[in-house]
Amino acid sequence: TLKRAILERRFGKMYSVNINVFWTRPQEYYNQAKWRGTWAMDGGALMNQASHYVDLLTWLIGPIADVHAMTGILARDIEVEDTAVLNIRWRSGALGSMNVTMLTYPKNMEGSITVIGEKGTVKVGGVAVNEIQYWEFSNKRDYDKNIFKNNYQTDSVYGSGHVRYYKNVIDTLNGNTDPETDGEEGLKSLETLIAAYLSSRSGKIVSLPLDR
C-alpha cells in the first residue's frame, strides 16, 4: 500500500526517509554455526539481517545518489558488523538514514520505515514493517479508511514473506505467473550494500552507480 501511494505521487516532493532495524542476535546465535558472523559465508547486520530493508531504499524510494556509512563491532565476537548507520541522498534530492543494530535489549524491537513528503507522512513499523502506524495525506483516497486493516501480527521478524516468495518462484517456473522481482532489482540492493561497506572503510561519501 505504501508502494501504491508512492506510485500515485501522493507524497508530492519526497523530503525525508528513515529506516530502523532494531533487532537482537546474542552471541549464542553466532556460536551455533562456524559460518555465522563471518565475511566469507555470512555478512553482517547490513548484509544479512537488514538486507530486505536495504531493498526498500531503492524499490520504494528510487535510485540512490550518495551513501555515507559507519559500521562497527560493538559487542559481539564476530568478524562482521553488529551495528551500522547510513546517511543517504537519493537522486530525487530526498535525504534519509538507516539505523541497524543486532544489539537491542532484551529482544527484537522494531523494523520500520518512515516517509515524509510535501503532502504526506507515513510510518510503517512493528517488529517487521507489519503495522501501519501513521498514515496522513492531503489528498485523500477511498482506501485510506481501511488502511489499518493491513496490519498483522507476526512472531518472526522475517514475517511470512519467504513462503510467498517461494510460491512465486515455483509458479513462475511452472509458467503460471511472472516473477515479482528479478536479478536487476537484486543488483541495486547489492550495490547499495557494497557502497555502504566502501564508505565505512574509507570514511568518505560513495556515489552510485559504482564503477563496474
Protein language model annotation of sequence segments:
Residues 1-78, 203:
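Predominantly a Rossmann-like dinucleotide-binding segment in NAD(P)-dependent oxidoreductases
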Residues 3, 58, 87, 166-170, ...:
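Non-transmembrane alpha-helical segments in soluble domains
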Residues 51, 76, 99-107:
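Glycine-rich phosphate/pyrophosphate-binding beta-alpha loops
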Residues 192-202:
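Short arginine-rich
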